[in-house]
Amino acid sequence: MSYPYQIKTLEAYHEAYKNSIDHPEKFWGDIAENFTWRKKWDKVLDWNFTEPKVEWFKGGKLNITENCIDRHLAKNADKPAIIWEPNDPKENHRIITYKQLHLNVSQFAQVLINNGVQKGDRVCIYMGMIPELAIAVLACARIGAIHSVIFGGFSAQSIADRLDDAKATYIITCDGAYRGAKDIPLKSIIDDALVGNTTIKNVIVCTRTRTAVSMLKGRDLWWEDEIKKVEAQGITSVDAVEMDAEDPLFILYTSGSTGKPKGVVHSTAGYMVYTNYTFVNVFQYEPNDLFFCTADIGWITGHSYIVYAPLSAGGTSLMFEGIPTFPDAGRFWDIIDKFKVNILYTAPTAIRSLMSFGLGPVEGHDLSSLKVLGTVGEPINEEAWHWYDENIGKKKCPIVDTWWQTETGGIMISNMAGITPGKPGWATYPMPGVQTILVDDKGLEVTTIEEGLYRGNLCITQPWPATIRTTYGDHERCRTNYFATYPNLYFTGDGALKNELGQIRITGRVDDVLNVSGHRIGTAEVENAINMHAGVVESAVVGYPHDIKGQGIYAYVIYTGSHAQDTHGSAEMIRKDILQTVTRIIGPIAKPDKIQFVSGLPKTRSGKIMRRILRKVAEGELNSLGDTSTLLDPAVVDEIVKGVI
């Protein structure tokens, strides 16, 4: 497969960028011609950022799975589409060709049809990182059902909230999942999530861990039994349902600055075109490259760069079930050596974690197949960038530092491997079609330069094809979250620096959202969970610098129980109890790293918590707390400083 829209020189990047901003309809219309359509569009773009309304390839008809699977069958039926490496290195890996993927997706699509799933139905997927997860996602897309994948680390309560919000009618899960040395009982977590649920008709359960599970007659079905029924029907191919360009493809829940996670909705055509375009250009993907994205499909990175983009490009995507440190810290390097991986796309958290083991685990591995390295999820610190460059890339592989979000669908700011220059710690240049602007808190463009840098809140001025379309069931929330802070701009929630060359460095969130190990967690969400613990009066959560995770979670907790402040042992028990509550309500990814018991929180006279002060204390910047005289009770700050962990 060739990619006529692949940028090959720096001059071509600048030309493409200019064309994309000056003539977005022509630019994206020309790229979209390279895909399979049932009917071409009537209009490339219709938009405003006030409602907001964003429509790409309006009137176009297609199915994304015809672009990810069917169109490759004529010439590449026997090419590996997905290579799967299991959690346990002693277990055999699996190779799924495009021909097999077509069969697997068709048969599971028929399973869904047999059980009454229709176009527009919401199907929740809660599975481990096995090929059946990708197959389930694509089978939903094939019949026009809207998939909503939930990361396997979320609790029953978190799942229940998402099922309720999406009004999901079907669930696809596994008996259990392997993650390093742990077995996660996915089906029993789903059972807990379904207590009191009235919308779910069926739960389809795929066998992975052979964990004993409860199966309810009339509701729960085994994946394998349902496939056997389809085989008995003699069905080997299912026609893809024709979708409108703007039909929803999936819902993916992400944390916001308020407590309730929001369901980000992506559409079909724009998402397909944009993820493919960024994949081919950022990584300079060649048709026979093996691409290894280490993310989980439960996050946007896995949706876009394990499933949809590599497959729409006719590429080969490596999917890994386990974690980088199991059975030892050489696992990534084993996989790269074993399969001769060409492109590695991972998170700074993983790199920092592997750095802490030293070079022993890297030694003895042949990493010479690597051509491009990438990072995603959070800004990469320079120390980790240099370690990655020297020890993994051997100073021969460009590192693409990609900035984007669940809401943007695909990569927004990044150097292109070997084409545009990289810079340690900098995401550098925006993708074609992405017009950035830095604004001050009033929404005015930052025009003053300090020490060669512009500093402000990062916004986008015009739509790109994979722009968020809405938050599921609540369009007003989409407007207020992203398009109301600064009128006619998409507000990213991130702060940034820009140099005189136009290169951008992301400095981190400017709202009440934490970035922990590359995963977004809302402070309000964690506070709500802590506050549900018996004995907790109030809490405040902030981020602080963490050597491995990038940001850690620091919780200040007012506890009424008689023994929070007495002996260390009792306080420690309460800490553990609170952590257990957070795990139950949200999941282990949201557990605070530090809990400090306090008698009060720094509040203004109007009752607002001064998080700025709490952040400074958590960061250890005790000499720059600023003016505390406006606080209701300034003495609270002294007490907090004395008890800092």
Whereabouts are the PLM-identified features?
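Conserved AMP-binding/adenylate-forming core of the ANL superfamily
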Residues: 65, 82-138, 155-160, 215, ...
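AMP-binding/adenylate-forming catalytic core of the ANL superfamily
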Residues: 150-176, 190, 337, 344, ...
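Gly/Ser/Thr-rich phosphate-binding loop
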Residues: 227, 315, 342-346, 355-424, ...
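Conserved AMP-binding/adenylation subdomain of ANL enzymes
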Residues: 270-290, 300-343, 357-359
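Conserved ATP/PPi-binding loop(s) of AMP-dependent carboxylate-activating enzymes
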Residues: 429-433, 444-482, 521, 622-623
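Conserved beta-loop-beta connector loops within the AMP-binding
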Residues: 437-462, 498-501, 569-571, 575, ...
